[in-house]
Amino acid sequence: MTLKTALQYFGRDFEFPNSIAGLPDKLSDVEGLEIGSFKTNDGVSLSYWKAGKGIPLVFVPGWSSNGAEYINLIHILKQDYEVYVLDQRNHGLSDKVTFGNRISRFSADLNDFFTALDIEKAHLCGWSMGCSVIWSYIDLYGDQKIEKLAFIDEAPSIYCHSDWTEEERIKSGAFTISAEAMISMYYGKGPSNRLAVNTDIHDFYTVVGAPAFENSHSLYEQFVPPDMAALELVLFDHIMNDWRDIFLYKIKRPTLVVSGEHSNWVESQRWIAETVPDGKALIFAKNENGDHFLHLKEPLKFSSQLKAFLQA
């Protein structure tokens, strides 16, 4: 296991394009930021971003994301927590491999992360596919190491079965009838339509009107650009999972479910919060950048709400 300061790792500082009160102006403003790595039990080197002291708060990013996009959240939350952001296999600074590209293996990686860093208890916060990784982790390893849970805008089932009622589709958040069509749309490989893939998520993947997201995304593009070929390998498995039973039978910890009025599956987020034993829904309004990228666009508001939940 290795650990370097962020400036040692990247070899230089980085200045963000926008100066925003309460957020870093440059990478070196995130005091104590370190980049570490560890080996999984199948020999893959995974990286993580770390700063702060206190109860561990572990972020599991969504598909294609990594610690660079979380730089603002790290800066804010390190005042109260030992903050970690895990770069999953084929993501960010972690190894790019052609094996183990399924959600169950990603959750095993999360378990290996807890073991390697000797973390006995932590808050867990997942976003998008990162939620699925946590759901799989709970399914396979239980919740003994979890204090509280937070989930950001992930549908319980992306894939819609042809024999589901409309009520089932809405509660599951399903928005595609073809994993292949969804992957093709994500990669711009061919035409799509609302029947095959019903989402406008890409319309909101923009830094326009979101200077905080422009800052974190600029670090992401400069230092940790995505390997799109490697990222594609996990998508089919990710799309085809149905996690609804996890909320019905497995999750017992206090749970915050965060979404926005722009989300195509916001009703499924309300369903999760209503279904788990101790759940709470937090819905960002449209004028609060209430879309799939809300925590990156509004890091100050999101961090404040997350802290209030964790400290309650």
Regions found by a protein language model. Name each.
Residues 223-274:
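Conserved serine/cysteine hydrolase catalytic core
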Residues 1-57, 80-81, 119-120, 147, ...:
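Alpha/beta-hydrolase fold catalytic core
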Residues 44-96:
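Conserved HGGG/HGGXW glycine-rich cap/lid loop of the alpha/beta-hydrolase fold
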Residues 120-163:
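Conserved hydrolase catalytic core segment
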Residues 279-312:
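Catalytic active-site module of serine/aspartate enzymes centered on a nucleophile-bearing elbow/loop
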Residues 64, 88-92, 131, 156, ...:
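Alpha/beta-hydrolase active-site loop signature
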Residues 41, 49, 85-129, 140, ...:
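Active-site loop/oxyanion-hole signature of alpha/beta-hydrolase fold enzymes
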Residues 146-188:
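Flexible "cap/lid" loop of the alpha/beta hydrolase fold
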